Design a protein with these regions (language model features):
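C-terminal segment of classical bacterial N-terminal signal peptides
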Residues: 4-13
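Exported/extracytosolic protein signature
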Residues: 13-227
């Protein structure tokens, strides 16, 4: 029940907003996203629903990734309506967004959002951070956004996922409707490419000019000479 829900601390968490938490054994009795704390599918707490992994790697999803120049990385957003299945509560107008900053810096944080018009709260978000020893930027790889679930398999999403419009999700089709329960959950994946500024090598050459007066029989080079 709502009364049994626990408000989780957010002081050191890169997610929000603060909201009640639920468990597999005691799911929500209303529509809310990514608030179950013991989901083994994503390693425990669903509030940590944004992850990073290098394309082509089988490594675990992580919240922090040190980038290499020219490499591509997946950003994953988990999407799960936590309403108990027996309540038949369907989330409406479900939209996913990924904010990929265009800044150049040594750390760049991306933010994933999942929204629904009848969810409480309407929007939940989580962050993950890329880093490098040198300044870099992230570029969204156009056409890379996908949604994977049991209802549709893998479905292409529009590039609007990385702007304010976002991408509409769904279960059996992209109609914005996602019922409550694990079987209706899904994953959004997006590719980004790292462009690292390469440090410039020092090319300045210090030249020293020396002369000698051959007519005076000088055999050593000096910086000045008497005529």
């Amino acid at each position: 029940s709502i009364l049994a829900a626990v408000i989780a601390p957010v002081a050191v968490m890169a997610w929000g907003p603060a909201r009640p938490s639920f468990t597999i054994e005691k799911p929500a009795d209303y529509i809310t996203f990514n608030s179950i704390t013991n989901n083994p599918v994503i390693g425990g707490d669903e509030k940590d629903f944004v992850g990073i992994r290098e394309v082509g790697s089988n490594a675990n999803w992580t919240n922090n990734m040190k980038v290499q120049n020219g490499k591509e990385y997946y950003v994953r957003i988990y999407v799960h309506n936590n309403a108990a299945s027996n309540l038949n509560l369907v989330a409406e107008n479900v939209v996913a967004k990924l904010n990929v900053p265009t800044t150049t810096a040594k750390t760049v944080t991306v933010q994933g959002q999942v929204s629904a018009s009848n969810a409480k709260p309407n929007t939940v978000w989580d962050e993950a951070t890329f880093s490098s020893d040198n300044d870099f930027n992230l570029a969204y790889v156009a056409g890379s956004a996908l949604f994977e679930n049991n209802g549709m398999g893998t479905t292409k999403l529009p590039d609007s996922i990385v702007n304010n419009t976002g991408a509409t999700l769904g279960y059996s089709k992209l109609d914005g409707k996602i019922p409550g329960c694990f079987q209706y959950a899904g994953y959004v994946t997006v590719k980004v490419k790292a462009q690292v500024n390469q440090p410039q090598e020092k090319t300045d050459i210090d030249l020293a000019k020396t002369v000698r007066n051959k007519t005076n029989g000088e055999k050593t080079w000096t910086e000045t000479v008497s005529a």
